[in-house]
């Protein structure tokens, strides 16, 4: 079972059949090099060189001659090792081959051949041949023992396959008997069944391949590829399980596994070991050992091919080799013929070839059968250093050393460390490697492998110098003398060598064969030696060579193998002799035949070792519990303590003294161990104390950094009280979300119903005779069949009444189906919008819920439990800790509290300063926010409100993202800081409040006007307050655009603030929990801040609700105004249709109407001259803008320059000379659209002085003290100057019949916002509409001035245009004084700038004003307004006639073609 044959190369038992000799792949081996044909390997100096041990042993010569190994086959049991006197020397140079019994061989000379004899090369027998049936190595060893008279133990007799008589519990007795018979018939004399045979038997069961594979895996418990009988029985049992339909288990039960393994062990110990114990280990490698047990064998060389080298090759192959003592003649005695073979072996002279034996040493016969004798010089043995020799080209030997000083030395058994000397040249770079790997300060900074690598010749074995260096390294790194180096330390050491990771992994695997994760001193030396070899170019071996196996490992493995062999052979012999029946009664020790050191003929046979030890139970002394109870014969046997007492009393004085000395030595050793342990403990304590102090210093530094960080106050969020408060607040907000969502849905439903109702009203106005003009009386305002019947009856009555009155019957424009289709289409649109809004509401609700969950998760500390919280509080309170740690914790708390108080004081000072600076800023000017990229150190974001605001901003960000996903893209804006955001929000609140007040006043005025209009009672023009501000114009597209821009800007600002909040939120998560003693105070502060925040939030929500109501009312007002416009248009169309039908009958009435028109214009001119007198109370050549400019800005002499709008600076120059003044109607027309703008920036900038409502108007309003180039600001100034111009009464003035100023076809920039609704609303269409307006305007009573002023020119349905310029001004224009006035400002361009789009074309200049009364200009082109100079109350006929003569009245009868766009330009003549 354990092969330990020491056969040579080519022997009969040198290799097992089919087994690859180990280390076949190794190329560099110390003494068994492989020589391919025609190539000689360069010899290497070896550390542990094999030595000849007394019989012929072919070794490769160190001189490089191609000497082939000789197969001998002789056992190593009887010959003693020969000492050559020089450790590490080359093998014996000249020995005669010994007869081996295999084949006769010619003698060979080792070393350099003599001069007279050419080198002879033998062709040895091939190694690795299969075993010969004639003789085995064991039989040859036994034959040697027989010849020497020794009595070896009887060899085990082959008794066939023996199966122990053990009953297996998992099968029946009958099945076990059948399985035994089948197993014996299949294996014969073997104890195991091969895998192939087992496969044939198992395939007969006809099971599937997967089942058989699983059965084999479960059965082959030894994983050897063979089955013992219990394994075979288990396989049969598992096959039976599968054949009966049951499933195979994944793992065997413990009982079955134990039974099978126990029986396998019993069978294995019955197998005898046929190999004898080696008496003496030699340097001959054992090539027959298994892979894991051959600890001594180098790789088996391959058999080289015979080749006859030439002399030149021999000369080239000779290199310097260390030589020492001359070899001694060995061999068998010539007069003995062993084993029946005639072999006359004479002693063979050795030594240096070609030199006479002039030394004092004579060859000594060593006889094979004689006693072992030492050879060579037998005098004293002083150590001799290695002496290098070398043969130059002339083959002259160099120094060989003196013969007198050479003595026999140990031979260097493989693995016998410390007895191999280094080469004479020393080991290069070894000191550099030592210095590199030694622990030293600063080694972490890097290392260099320069100087470590080389190409030195390094032997396999570790030399004494190397071992000393490696031991020093080990002790330097093993500071606590633990006896080993851990993996981390070894990685640090080995990593400094510079080798790559793969090589270091392989080296570690070889050095740590037991996989313990650490290295002792010997294993560390092995690893360092392999690293040293690798640095010098040698590859890392795949298997550890025998020279490098540590002695501890090798001896332990050999001892285990020997004990197993002894046990098995002893058990077998005792079974054969029957001695096992009474093992304690025989009195014979069979252990005398065995020894760890060798057989009975070994020199140490008289010495006892562990194999002869026998335990003596009576020798044990001490207390015996049975000594106190001796009850006659029934009791237990008396204790043998008396005999031990007697044995101690019989000790002599010397023995007692010896015991005392031993005890003293043990006590000293114990004291030394205690001192060493105490020193180690002190060192550990000092190290722990240093580490603790270093850690406390680091904690202090980190705490100081936390306390001084700008965001240090945010760590209060980790406080449990504040976290709970935030949770409650978050829960309150979550509870409000469903209510807000339901409110939004209710508002959406109301909006949808209002839209449907509005559509019904509009459709009824657009189609007055349609079936849709039916008031539904059903549920929800639905139209029932009864309503339709009533509507048809009403239509028939109207038709009959028209027929009776002589009027044509009202034509039905569409049928009921068309009205239903329109309603259905509008309902579908409304429903789609409502569903879209509902989806947006759901998305916003989901995003709010997701954000609330994320906030709740962030506020909820999942990892915290009651136990951890309790332990944390105990640690913070310094409970259960040492005094040093308690003082340290209290010191940290004091420092943190001081820093917190200091931070709070700084934060209180910072907001007050920022607040003061905010108050000092002008409220009307908003500086552009600079991009915020700085730190947050100056931010007052250390309060509860700031954190809540940040959370609100994050929620708004999510909502904005959902809105953006729905198609509403927020406007991108540069990010702003928290201070800027707070300032902006404050200004917005002030502006919203101001706008709310203004809109309240405007809404009240609109309500009063609407009530008066619905009652139909015209207000007296004389009661109009002087300077009353006109009501707001209907909403425009620009107002809606400004509102959208405002919301987008706010969303972008919120989104920009969220980016900044992200970093703060991350810092909040990492904050520390505050001290326990501050909890109560912080809770009170948090509660107060929460109450303040709730109050502020409620106020803000109230303001927001008020603003929302105002916005809603504004929308309703817009819808009502639009409805009124559509109703007026419908009435105009209706009248137009009637007039078109009766145009033939009214032909005669046209002349009368023209006369009425002239009279009406004359009356209108008279009233307008009376009312507008104070408005034009300016110098003759001045204008309102010119009079305002000096008051607003006195220093610049030309006032038009600052009054010109920035968007159109190029238009002011050509228009200044040709436009003397701006009419008040144009001013009012240009100002009225802006009255309803919701843009906060426009409201803030454009209303510095007149934005406040004026319930008690004054005659004149002082303009703002500050002049602005903003067009909106200038419009407000013009409004101030033109509004109080109406004094007196003008009963016949019809502002609604004035032709709008912006209806001139060449001005696109002066039109009102290019609104399609406004285009349709203009009543200046065809002549029929003009006539109808004139006709019904003269019939109706005069309208109140409030209604007249409210209407912008875009809403006037009549074509009559008002020209307030009197004739005297037109006549006085050419006769102006010599001092010409400054050029007037441009006409309504500044008013058009904010209304029109940015890309609107500039208006062309009007025609030049003639010096005298101009003729009527082309149709649609307004005349240049004359400068107002008429005094107040000047209403004489001369002025009116002069204005009529100027052509004013003639323009009013021009037909305005509505087939073209009202905003299109015309080419002037």
From Swiss-Prot:
Amino acid composition bias (Basic and acidic residues), ranges on this chain: 818-845, 943-961, 981-1016, 1039-1106, 1117-1137, 1144-1161
Compositionally biased spans, kind Low complexity: 17-52, 85-124, 347-366, 908-917, 933-942, 1210-1227, 1368-1378
SUPFAM superfamilies: EF-hand
Biased composition (Polar residues): 54-83, 323-346, 391-401, 634-646, 1264-1284, 1456-1469
Pfam families: DUF1720, EH, WH2
Domain EH residues, every copy: 175-263, 466-555
Single GO molecular function: actin binding
Keyword Coiled coil: yes
Highest rank taxon of the organism: Eukaryota
PROSITE patterns reported in the protein's UniProt record: EF_HAND_2, EH, WH2
Topology of the protein relative to the lipid bilayer: Peripheral membrane protein
Self-association state and partner proteins as the record states: Component of the PAN1 actin cytoskeleton-regulatory complex.
Role of this protein: Component of the PAN1 actin cytoskeleton-regulatory complex required for the internalization of endosomes during actin-coupled endocytosis. The complex links the site of endocytosis to the cell membrane-associated actin cytoskeleton. Mediates uptake of external molecules and vacuolar degradation of plasma membrane proteins. Plays a role in the proper organization of the cell membrane-associated actin cytoskeleton and promotes its destabilization.
Annotated protein name in UniProt: Actin cytoskeleton-regulatory complex protein pan1
């Amino acid at each position: 079972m354990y092969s330990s044959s020491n056969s040579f190369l080519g022997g009969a038992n040198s290799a097992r059949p089919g087994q690859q000799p180990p280390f076949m792949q190794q190329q560099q081996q110390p003494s068994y090099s492989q020589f391919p044909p025609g190539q000689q390997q360069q010899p290497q100096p070896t550390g542990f060189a094999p030595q000849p041990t007394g019989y012929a042993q072919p070794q490769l010569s160190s001189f490089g001659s191609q000497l082939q190994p000789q197969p001998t086959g002789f056992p190593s049991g009887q010959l003693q090792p020969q000492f050559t006197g020089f450790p590490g020397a080359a093998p014996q140079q000249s020995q005669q081959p010994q007869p081996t019994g295999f084949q006769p061989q010619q003698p060979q000379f080792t070393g350099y051949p003599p001069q007279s004899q050419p080198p002879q090369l033998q062709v040895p027998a091939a190694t690795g041949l299969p075993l010969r049936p004639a003789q085995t190595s064991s039989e040859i060893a036994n034959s040697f023992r027989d010849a020497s008279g020794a009595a070896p133990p009887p060899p085990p007799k082959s008794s066939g396959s023996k199966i122990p008589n053990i009953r297996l519990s998992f099968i029946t007795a009958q099945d076990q008997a059948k399985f035994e018979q089948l197993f014996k018939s299949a294996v014969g004399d073997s104890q195991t069944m091969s895998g192939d045979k087992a496969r044939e038997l198992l395939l007969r069961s006809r099971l599937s391949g997967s089942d058989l594979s699983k059965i084999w895996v479960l059965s082959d418990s030894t994983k050897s590829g063979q089955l013992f009988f219990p394994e075979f029985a288990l396989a049969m049992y598992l096959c039976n399980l599968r054949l009966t339909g049951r499933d195979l288990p994944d793992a065997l039960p413990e009982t079955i596994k134990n039974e099978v393994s126990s029986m396998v062990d019993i069978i294995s110990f019955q197998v005898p070991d046929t190999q004898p114990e080696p008496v003496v280990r030699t340097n001959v490698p054992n090539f027959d050992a298994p892979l894991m047990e051959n600890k001594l064998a180098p790789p088996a060389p391959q058999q080289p091919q015979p080749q006859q080298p030439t002399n030149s090759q021999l000369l080239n192959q000779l290199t310097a080799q260390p030589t020492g003592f001359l070899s001694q003649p060995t061999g068998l005695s010539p007069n003995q013929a062993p084993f029946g073979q005639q072999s006359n072996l004479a002693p063979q002279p050795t030594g240096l070839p070609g030199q006479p034996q002039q030394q004092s040493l004579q060859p000594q016969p060593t006889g094979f059968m004689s006693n072992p004798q030492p050879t060579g010089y037998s005098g004293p043995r002083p150590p001799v250093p290695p002496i290098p020799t070398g043969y130059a080209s002339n083959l002259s030997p160099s120094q060989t050393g003196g013969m007198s000083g050479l003595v026999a030395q140990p031979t260097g058994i493989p693995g016998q460390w410390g007895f191999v000397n280094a080469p004479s040249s020393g080991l290069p770079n070894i000191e550099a490697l030592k210095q590199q790997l030694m622990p030293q300060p600063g080694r972490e900074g890097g290392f260099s492998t320069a100087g470590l690598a080389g190409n030195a010749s390094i032997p396999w074995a570790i030399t004494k110098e190397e071992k000393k260096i490696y031991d020093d390294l080990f002790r330097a790194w093993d500071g606590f003398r633990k006896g080993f180096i851990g993996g981390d330390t070894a990685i640090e050491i080995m990593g400094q060598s510079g080798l790559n990771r793969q090589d270091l992994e392989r080296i570690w695997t070889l050095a740590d064969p037991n996989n313990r994760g650490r290295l002792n001193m010997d294993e560390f030396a092995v690893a360092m030696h392999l690293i040293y070899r690798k640095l010098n170019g040698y590859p890392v071996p795949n298997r550890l060579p025998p020279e490098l196996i540590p002695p501890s490992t090798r001896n332990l493995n050999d001892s285990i193998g020997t004990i197993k062999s002894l046990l098995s052979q002893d058990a077998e012999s005792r079974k054969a002799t029957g001695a096992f029946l009474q093992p304690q009664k025989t009195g014979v020790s069979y252990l005398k035949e065995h020894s760890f050191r060798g057989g009975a003929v070994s020199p140490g046979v008289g010495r006892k070792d562990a194999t002869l030890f026998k335990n003596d139970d009576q020798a044990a002394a001490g207390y015996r519990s049975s000594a106190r109870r001796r009850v006659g014969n029934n009791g237990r046997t008396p204790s043998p303590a008396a005999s031990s007492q007697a044995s101690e009393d019989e000790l002599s004085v010397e023995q007692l003294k010896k015991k005392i000395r031993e005890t003293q030595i043990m006590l000293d050793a114990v004291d030394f161990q205690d001192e060493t342990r105490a020193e180690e403990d002190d060192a550990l304590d000092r190290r722990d104390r240093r580490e603790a102090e270093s850690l406390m210093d680091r904690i202090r530094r980190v705490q100081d950094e936390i306390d001084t960080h700008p965001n240090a106050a945010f760590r209060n969020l980790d406080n449990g009280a504040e976290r709970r408060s935030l949770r409650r607040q978050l829960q309150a907000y979550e509870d409000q979300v469903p209510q807000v969502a339901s409110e939004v849905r209710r508002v959406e439903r109301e909006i949808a119903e209002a839209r449907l109702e509005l559509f019904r009203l509009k459709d009824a106005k657009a189609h007055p005779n349609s079936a849709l003009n039916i008031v539904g009386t059903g549920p929800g305002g639905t139209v029932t069949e009864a309503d339709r019947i009533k509507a048809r009856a009403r239509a028939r009555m109207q038709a009959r009444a028209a027929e009776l009155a002589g009027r044509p019957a009202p034509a039905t424009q569409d049928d009921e189906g068309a009205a239903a289709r329109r309603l259905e289409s509008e309902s579908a649109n409304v429903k789609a919008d409502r569903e879209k809004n509902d989806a947006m509401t759901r998305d916003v609700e989901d995003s709010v819920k997701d954000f609330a969950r994320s906030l709740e998760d962030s506020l909820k500390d999942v990892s915290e439990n009651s136990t951890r919280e309790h332990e944390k509080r105990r640690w913070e309170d310094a409970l259960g800790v040492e005094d040093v740690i308690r003082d340290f914790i209290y010191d940290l708390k004091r420092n943190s509290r001081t820093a917190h108080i200091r931070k709070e004081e700084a934060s209180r000072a910072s907001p007050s300063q920022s607040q003061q600076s905010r108050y000092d800023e002008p409220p009307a000017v908003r500086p552009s926010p600079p991009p915020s990229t700085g730190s947050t150190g100056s931010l007052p974001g250390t309060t509860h409100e700031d954190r809540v605001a940040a959370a609100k901003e994050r929620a708004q960000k999510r909502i904005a993202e959902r809105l953006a996903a729905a198609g509403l893209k927020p406007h991108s804006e540069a990010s702003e800081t928290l201070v800027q955001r707070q300032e902006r929000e404050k200004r917005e609140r002030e502006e919203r409040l101001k706008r709310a007040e203004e809109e309240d006043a405007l809404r009240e005025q609109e309500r009063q006007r609407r009530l008066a209009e619905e009652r139909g009672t015209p207000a007296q023009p004389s009661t109009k307050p002087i300077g009353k501000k006109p009501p707001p114009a209907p909403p425009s597209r620009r107002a809606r655009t400004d509102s959208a821009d405002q919301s987008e800007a706010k969303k972008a600002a919120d989104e920009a603030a969220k980016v900044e909040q992200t970093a703060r939120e991350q810092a909040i998560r990492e904050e520390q929990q505050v001290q326990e003693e501050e909890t109560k105070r912080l809770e009170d502060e948090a509660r107060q801040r929460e109450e303040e925040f709730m109050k502020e939030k409620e106020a803000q929500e109230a303001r927001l609700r008020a603003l929302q109501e105002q916005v809603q009312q504004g929308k309703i007002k817009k819808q009502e105004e639009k409805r009124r416009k559509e109703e007026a248009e419908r009435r105009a169309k209706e009248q137009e249709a009637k007039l078109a039908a009766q145009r033939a009958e009214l032909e005669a009435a046209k002349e009368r109407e023209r006369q009425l028109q002239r009279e009406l214009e004359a009356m209108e001119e008279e009233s307008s001259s009376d009312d507008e007198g104070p408005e034009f109370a300016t110098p003759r050549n001045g204008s309102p803008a010119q009079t305002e400019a000096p008051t607003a800005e006195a220093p610049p002499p030309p006032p038009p320059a600052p009054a010109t709008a920035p968007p159109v600076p190029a238009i002011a120059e050509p228009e200044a000379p040709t436009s003397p003044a701006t009419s008040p109607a144009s001013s009012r027309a240009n100002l009225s659209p802006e009255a309803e703008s919701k843009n906060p920036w426009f409201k803030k900038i454009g209303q510095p002085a007149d934005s406040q409502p004026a319930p008690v108007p004054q005659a004149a309003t002082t303009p703002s003290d500050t002049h602005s180039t903003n067009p909106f600001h200038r419009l407000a100034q013009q409004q101030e100057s033109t509004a109080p111009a109406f004094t007196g009464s003008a009963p016949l003035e019809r502002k609604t019949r004035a032709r709008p100023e912006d209806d001139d076809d060449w001005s696109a920039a002066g039109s009102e916002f290019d609104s399609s609704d406004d285009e349709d609303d203009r009543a200046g269409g065809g002549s029929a509409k003009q006539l109808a307006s004139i006709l019904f305007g003269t019939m109706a009573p005069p309208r109140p001035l409030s209604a007249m002023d409210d209407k912008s020119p875009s809403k006037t349905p009549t074509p009559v245009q008002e020209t307030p310029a009197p004739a005297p001004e037109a006549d006085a224009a050419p006769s102006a004084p010599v001092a010409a006035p400054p050029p007037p400002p441009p006409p309504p361009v500044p008013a058009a700038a904010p209304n029109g789009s940015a890309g609107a074309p500039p208006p062309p200049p009007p025609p030049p004003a003639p010096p005298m009364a101009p003729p009527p200009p082309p149709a649609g082109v307004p005349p240049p307004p004359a400068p107002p100079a008429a005094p107040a109350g000047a209403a004489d006929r001369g002025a009116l006639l002069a204005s009529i003569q100027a052509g004013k009245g003639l323009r009013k009868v021009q037909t305005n073609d509505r087939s073209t766009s009202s905003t299109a330009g015309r080419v002037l003549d």
